[in-house]
């Protein structure tokens, strides 16, 4: 069973998600990666949650999982078909994610990851949007750090709340 990438449907045949955030993402994400819309609408995956007991334990488990990722991709490669034809990849899903510019971690994290580095990384990631007054506002070329410093003119320089950070973190795909 092909489960990592829709093996049959063309992108144009997939209905758009009616949520307003997806309207903004559908418009803006292709600027950051040629296959961003395929990632949004035609991929799926299995997640693994790993508990940790301390920052040191987290760092060790993060490093191990990073090194194991290529093996996991190979073991679970099940998306060789795209639009009823061979895609030329055992994991077309992996190819799509390599052409989506909303995530991945700098290679420095692979050796020496800690909470502070991830927080700095997250605060420096460009934002996709802000949710304010029951509306998603597209934000381009601004980081969450800019938002924290009141430098987002699109929302009258309001300062972020915890819910804004949660929303931003939900748009960083690592």
Please identify what each model-predicted range represents.
Residues 40-51:
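Glycine-rich, often proline-containing surface loops adjacent to acidic residues and nearby aromatics
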Residues 39, 56, 60, 67, ...:
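C-terminal accessory/tail domains of diverse enzymes
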Residues 14, 31, 52, 92-93:
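Catalytic cofactor-binding cores of redox enzymes
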Residues 22-29, 49, 62-73:
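Short, well-ordered alpha-helical packing segments
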Residues 6-8, 54, 71:
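Short loop/turn segments at secondary-structure transitions that flank enzyme active sites
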Residues 1-36, 42, 174:
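Terminal catalytic/cofactor-binding subdomain
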Residues 2-6, 52, 76:
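Glycine-rich, histidine-containing beta strand-loop boundary motifs that form or position
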């Amino acid at each position: 069973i092909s489960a990592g990438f829709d093996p049959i449907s063309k992108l144009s045949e997939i209905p758009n998600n009616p949520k307003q955030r997806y309207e903004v993402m559908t418009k803006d994400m292709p600027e950051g990666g040629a296959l961003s819309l395929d990632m949004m609408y035609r991929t799926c995956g299995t997640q693994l949650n790993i508990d940790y007991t301390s920052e040191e334990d987290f760092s060790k488990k993060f490093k191990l999982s990073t090194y194991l990722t290529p093996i996991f991709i190979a073991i679970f490669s099940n998306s060789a078909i795209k639009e009823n034809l061979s895609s030329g990849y055992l994991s077309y899903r992996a190819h799509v994610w390599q052409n989506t510019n909303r995530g991945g971690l700098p290679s420095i994290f692979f050796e020496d990851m800690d909470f502070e580095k991830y927080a700095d990384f997250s605060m420096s990631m460009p934002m996709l949007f802000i949710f304010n007054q029951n509306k998603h506002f597209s934000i381009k070329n601004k980081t969450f750090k800019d938002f924290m410093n009141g430098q987002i003119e699109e929302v009258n320089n309001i300062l972020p709340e915890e819910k804004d950070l949660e929303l931003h973190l939900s748009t960083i795909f690592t």
